[in-house]
Amino acid sequence: MKRLFQNVIFDSSVAIPMSQSAPASVLATPALAFNKMSLSPSASGYRNRTSGGLNNVGSNGYYWSTAANSRANAYNLNFNASNVNPLNNNNRANGFSVRAVRAYTTDAEPLSYYHMKLSQRELNHLLTLAYLDARKNERNETAPLRFELNFEKYIRNLADRIYTRQWRPSPQICFIITKPTIREVFAPAFEDRVVSHLLFNMIAPLAERSFIYDSYSCRKGKGTLFGVDRFEHFLRGATENWKKPAFVLSADIKGYFMHINKAILYMELCKMLSKYSDRYISAGVRWDDIVDMHLADYLSGSIIFRNPTDNCIRIGSPRDWEPLPPQKSQFYSPMGTGITIGDVMSQLFSNVYLNPFDQFCKRVLGMDRYGRYVDDARAVAATEEFLEACIPSMDEFLQSELMLSLHPEKTKITSTRGENIFLGADCREHRRYCVNKTISNFKAAVYELESIFVQNDTPLHIDDYYIALSRLNAGLGYLSHFKEWRMADRILSDSPLNQIFAFASDYSRAVIKPEIKNILNTYDYAQIYLC
């Protein structure tokens, strides 16, 4: 049965936990209208298709009933104005529940099909594109291979369930990771990842229109290095190219992912879709013409309001969870709060949720030099007093509108004369440095590769060599943005890996030596003895 919540259609099987009441500004959100059809429930009588009026209302509105077309088990409302007792409760004892038994027209389509703008063939095509996105870098994994073996069957079955609103997220796999920090990760089933990419491909281009320029996480053309470049640009602007002192506000949100309120997240997403649905992309083409807003509403609601801990499969020992603080675990999150880490939609949802906060900092507080990556924000200003005055307003906005708060220990103001750290980079006057933690991680990766090649007594598969090459180039490529070639030289100059890999003079990249490559091209397995 469909129900209305703030004039937005939900599916009744998707629970909306409201253990924490949403702010008044969210509850007062204007009605969301993705199409021009009426969302009011069925009334007594039927809708005249010619005039648009109601016919055969009669004296008694008895069409809400526990049994189809039955008056015996429902309240009987008398519309006769001369009747002293307009509400006839003669069947009150049997009126335990009601459901609509008459529609506007006798030939109305089922709601799930009526709201579907896409044809099933178009949905199959979009699911195929989503499948290709979901399997990137994972094509040789078991789940994508199993899906690919019966590709047409799985795609058609998934499209049918989405088209008829029968799709529900499957139980997730839960495990603990320890690098770079200990975290709890919920991995969705591969089919659910396909659906997540379907929704992402639908609404991400539209969401990009609402985000500020300096929101860096999980956006095409943005990322950590882009964020570092912008932060360095802010520093140079505030200090007038390092000629004057300036100050940096480091703002961190406490327990961000675990404290996201699902009801607020859903309403923010609905407001965003409603705001841009009628806007034009090009001449005569609106977003509503190319994006099925009702499908986006259905999928986003199903994903947001799912409980990841329901029937989840834990991988690992229960002891793996002991070092994890309870406030960082979904198993201890209050009902109706928290989204999982490990899903492509979680990344987009995190940006949608904090978009009002970004707009507040930029437009209301006047922080021109403000940028954010997930829950870590930086603001640069010429005076310390300005930043100090902004902190209470920022914290108040987070608490009143988003039910979040600034971390009291990690939120601080520092001078640009000292360390200016953001996203693993320390930006100084003449150059940017890589933080010690990143250098230590690169050293650990090199030592691990050395142990694999030196201490292993069995031949290694050809893939192992190319995996090692990818790991080396990932670290060297990142360090090259910080001009850390001297550090890379100290780590790799005397390494046994030099017998397998050749490094560029500035240590920006590595390649497999030609003589080693010839061996790998001849044999699937090879053992190179290093000294």
Predicted regions and their residues:
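Right-hand nucleic-acid polymerase module
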Residues: 188, 193, 197, 320-336, ...
